[in-house]
């Protein structure tokens, strides 16, 4: 946040916090390391050596399958549980993932904007001669592990989801997962504390849970289900944010998060600003670090009016789900009374249950009091929430 509407302590919030992102980095890169090592060892060893390395003799001179290995056997359609009973062909199928290297999608991650690592050549050591290949680094929060963290409901569920993460396909076109690599359990252990939401507060002492942050463009863009469930046990009203606008973040909130969690919203709070609507109306480009153009600092009702269809489409998207909509006009100091009133009146005509000007950035909680009252009033009205499609439909039908 910013101004008088922010979560504190800001320095802890932005610098490590409780280390959730670092746990994701370690978990993701562990998977990448296991993937590269598996490819290398399968090239260097025959089936028997691979099998013996995966299922070594214990102190009593016997081999035993771990629970993870039994899951892999089940996936392969092998019902035997004694390693000594497997045929030569079954041992080969069990031990060899036979990964098609051109299909590997699991790169490494780092929580630094280091552009020189975006594309790299790995395996350059003398012990890895002949195993060099191109790879790269992505930003940590883009990891699928972050998306899983936000969708999980408990440790068991998280363990199962980690096991289903696809890292590549084999030469038969079948998915190779973290479960196949044997790392899903280790990843879960590394994430055992990250599954716990972080409790922080606003400048005025309102509790705020901070947990997970998958991107809305490549993942689903929501805070965690666990954080929402805990918050609902502690407060009368819970406000949870979805990334981006009603055309992506809100739809993923409904289509993905609500389906998995079973939580149904009573109200959609649609945030709009005069500045953004002027941009949608054809205003000049806003460049970071440069002064705003006069169109954004002076009253310009025509430009603002031209951008209102954008807000209308967002409101319509929300109303399709049968949920009451309250438009929050997030007012800046440069907005004129005529401009904010134009947005407010237009929002009501679009079908919003209410539209309220909010000055929380400048005035804190007092500046958002009328908005809060409008949201409470809307929450007391019946909500007729519905999903727009059943999961059984084809992708084409859903779209």
Functional labels for PLM-detected ranges:
Residues 1-399:
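Flexible phosphate-sensing "switch/lid" loops adjacent to ATP/NTP-binding sites
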């Amino acid at each position: 946040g910013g101004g008088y509407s922010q979560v504190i302590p800001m320095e802890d919030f932005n610098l490590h916090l409780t280390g959730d992102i670092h746990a994701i980095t370690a978990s993701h890169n562990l998977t990448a390391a296991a993937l590269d090592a598996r490819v290398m060892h399968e090239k260097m060893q025959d089936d028997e050596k691979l099998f013996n390395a995966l299922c070594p003799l214990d102190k009593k001179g016997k081999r035993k399958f771990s629970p993870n290995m039994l899951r892999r056997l089940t996936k392969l359609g092998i019902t035997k549980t004694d390693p000594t009973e497997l045929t030569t062909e079954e041992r080969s199928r069990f031990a060899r993932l036979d990964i098609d290297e051109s299909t590997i999608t699991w790169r490494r991650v780092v929580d630094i904007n280091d552009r020189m690592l975006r594309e790299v050549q790995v395996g350059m050591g003398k012990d890895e001669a002949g195993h060099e290949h191109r790879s790269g680094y992505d930003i940590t929060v883009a990891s699928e592990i972050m998306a899983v963290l936000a969708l999980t409901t408990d440790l068991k569920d998280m363990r199962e989801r980690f096991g289903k993460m696809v890292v590549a396909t084999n030469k038969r076109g079948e998915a190779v997962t973290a479960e196949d690599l044997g790392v899903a359990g280790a990843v879960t252990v590394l994430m055992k504390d990250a599954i716990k939401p972080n409790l922080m507060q606003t400048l005025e002492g309102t509790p705020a849970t901070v947990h997970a942050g998958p991107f809305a463009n490549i993942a689903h863009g929501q805070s965690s289900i666990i954080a929402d469930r805990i918050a609902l046990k502690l407060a009368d009203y819970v406000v949870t944010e979805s990334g981006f606008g009603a055309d992506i973040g809100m739809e993923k909130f409904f289509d993905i998060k609500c389906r998995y969690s079973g939580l149904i919203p009573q109200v959609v709070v649609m945030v709009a600003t005069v500045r953004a609507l002027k941009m949608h109306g054809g205003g000049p480009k806003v460049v970071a670090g440069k002064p705003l153009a006069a169109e954004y600092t002076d009253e310009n009702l025509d430009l603002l009016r031209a951008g209102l269809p954008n807000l209308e489409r967002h409101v319509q998207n929300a109303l399709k789900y049968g949920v009451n909509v309250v438009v929050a006009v997030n007012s800046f100091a440069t907005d004129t009374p005529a401009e904010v009133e134009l947005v407010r009146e237009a929002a009501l005509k679009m079908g919003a249950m209410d539209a309220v000007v909010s000055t929380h950035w400048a005035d804190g909680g007092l500046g958002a009091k009328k908005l809060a009252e409008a949201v409470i009033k809307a929450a007391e009205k019946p909500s007729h929430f519905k999903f727009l499609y059943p999961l059984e439909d084809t992708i084409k039908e859903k779209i």
